[in-house]
Design a protein with these regions (language model features):
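PLP-dependent aminotransferase class I/II
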Residues: 5-178
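Glycine-rich phosphate-binding loop of ATP-grasp-fold ATP-dependent ligases
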Residues: 1-2
Length: 178
């Protein structure tokens, strides 16, 4: 779902979701197969649109919760040696996932196993694109992308988490690093 008040973004999104056709072209039969760009069949059903509208009503509350969670994690873990957070300006960004970066991939694997034993789920960071099958035929190393991917870890970040649960998670992480 895209929400915008920018006419250019709106028109581009409408074209992309309708096979690349410009707005209004469908109504003109002779131009209905005129495509100005590559597009896709991304049209919502009425049911999907209704669910999207209902979710939009919750958006502001979720944004506030996600920002609050991020602040809590940073407050509790920023002094732990071996953990880094990306610098995040919460005025412009809503961290949907709470990601931390460890000094090494070995430490990350150890932390994952430790937290699993404590019944705290985590997820490894996205693999860099150059490691995905369609892009492997390259001589480039992409050291920065590999480093971020190998050291990155997502902490629990559901909007249903309570402050108390975040404190428990952070205490376990601190215990691991002692």
């Amino acid at each position: 779902m895209i929400v915008t008040n920018d006419k250019q973004i709106y028109e581009r999104a409408m074209a992309l979701k309708d096979f690349g056709r410009e707005i209004g072209v469908k109504k003109q039969m002779e131009k209905s197969f005129s495509h100005s760009t590559i597009g896709y069949n991304f049209k919502f059903t009425e049911f999907q649109a209704a669910v999207g509208i209902a979710q939009m009503r919750k958006l502001e509350k979720r944004i506030l919760k996600k920002r609050s969670m991020f602040r809590k994690y940073v407050d509790l873990l920023s002094n732990v040696k071996g953990i880094e957070f990306l610098k995040t300006n919460l005025k412009n960004v809503t961290p949907w996932m709470i990601d931390i970066f460890l000094k090494s991939s070995v430490k990350r694997t150890q932390l994952i196993k430790y937290l699993e034993k404590k019944q705290i789920g985590t997820r490894i960071y996205y693999p860099p694109i150059h490691r995905l099958k369609p892009y492997r035929d390259t001589d480039q190393e992409y050291k920065q992308a590999s480093s971020f991917s190998d050291r990155g870890l997502w902490l629990p970040s559901s909007v249903t988490l309570t402050d108390k649960q975040i404190v428990i998670i952070c205490n376990q992480i601190k215990q691991f690093f002692k």
